[in-house]
Amino acid sequence: GATGSTGDIGPTGATGSTGDIGPTGATGSTGGVLDFADFYALMPPDNAATVAAGGDVDFPRDGPFSGAGIARTGADTFNLSEIGSYQVLFQVSVTEAGQLVLTLNSGAGAVELAYTVVGRATGTSQIVGVALVQTSVINSILTVRNPASESTALTITPLAGGTESVSAHLVITRLR
């Protein structure tokens, strides 16, 4: 004879037991700092008496660093070997009012990064700057500069506040 009609769906069965735990997944990449370097100067004797308008500050000594990804190419020029985001901190003691700016050369000449200009109107304290810099090509060159638009040279202050040499620092950290 003919096949009969399909019957009603029955009730859901009881939940089964939990299966075995699967294998551990691969370890992910480490987060945080990818590379860092500290460059510094002692005054005296490491910098010229003045840094002319449009001139770069020297940081001729090497502090702690993590590898070759951030390296000097001269006393005042620093290679950022990877495309990425970098946190840049710098401090320099100067005698007069003035400004400093970061420059980045990505192959077409050094460009002053206007968003990194820092300065002070009076006094003889340090000029301190902090900025994030994004590179778009490998081997970009970074400097700390007395802006070309300034009318006066900056005097790097030796022995500020006492008898010991005063340090200036440039710390570069690659974040991604």
Predicted regions located by residue number:
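Extracellular jelly-roll beta-sandwich "head" domains, especially the C-terminal globular C1q domain
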Residues: P11, D20-R176
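Low-complexity/repetitive intrinsically disordered segments
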Residues: G1-P11
